[in-house]
Amino acid sequence: GIIHSSLGGSEIAAWLPRQVINANNSFRTLRGNHWLDSPLISDWVRGRARKNISPRLNQGSPDHPYKPAFLYESGIAWTTPLPITGVIWYQGESDAEIIDNAQNGMLLKTMISSWRKAFRNPEMPFVMIQLPRINDPSKIRAGWPEFREMQDTVAKTVPQVYSVNTIDLGSTNADVHPPFKRPVGERAGNTALNKVYGKKVPCEGPAFKAFKTSGSSILVQMEHAAGLTTTDGKKPAQFEIAGTDGIYHPATAEITNRKGGTAVIRLSSPEVKSPKNARYCWNRFVTPNLVNGNQLPARPFRTDAPVLKK
C-alpha cells in the first residue's frame, strides 16, 4: 500500500525534522518566526504564509503548513514506526524559485538523510519525480531547468535515490499541476519495481554520457539509448550548442553510431563555427521528441554544468 502525505506548494524545509533544523547552523534562519524572512524560503511561500497568518504574528509564533518542520511533525513523524520500504517524492515547484543548485541540493540531501535516520533505514530508497515542463513565462518558473539538474545530480551522488524523468508530461499552459497523471505514476512505479524490487521493467530513458567536439560539430554520446528514435519521425528537437561566447543557438541533431545501448548525436549550427558546449531541453517549457525503444524520453542536460560538492 501507499501512505499519502503531501501539501501543495510546500518547500523542503517544511518536511525537515525540527531537531535537524536546530542542530544545523546553516538552517538558523528557519527557526522560529525567522523563516518568514529566510533566504532559504522562496518569496512566494513567504508571501503566502504572511498573508495567511499576519493577523496573529504579534501573538507569538503561529503555525502554518509551510512553516519549517511542520509537515514532518504533523505527518511523516507519525509513520516512522511503520516498516516503510521507500518513498516516492514529488516536490520542488516552490523551491525552484530560488535558482541555487548548491542550496537546493543541500536541503534535499539533508531531508533524505534525516528521513532515513528517522525510519532506521540508512538505505531507504527515494524515487524522485523530476520537475516536468511548464508553459509559464513568470519569473518564479525561470529556475526549473536548474532544479531538474539538481535533482539528477542528487540521484547520481546519493545511493538509492532515483530521478524519474517527466519532461514530456507537464502542462502546455501555466498550470503547475500536470494533466497527465497516469504516466507519471507508471514511470515512478516502474522505477520502484526495477530499482527496489529487482523486476526487469524498463525505467531508464536516454541520458547524457559524454561529449566531444569535432570540427564544427559536437558529438554527444547517450546511454540507455537502444532503439533511439523520435516520436514524430523528425530530427531530434530541443538541442542547442554554444561557442566560447556562451550564447546558445538551436542545433540540428542527427542520430549516428547506434551501438548496443548507446548512440551518438551529432549537433551543429550555422551560427556556431567552433562549438564548445551543448544542452538539451534546457528551458522551463519544451516539446521534446527524443525517446528510446521503450518510448521513454531523453533526460535534460547541459555539458557546462557547474561542479557541485557532494
Predicted segments with their positions:
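Cell-envelope and extracellular/periplasmic
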Residues: G1-K310
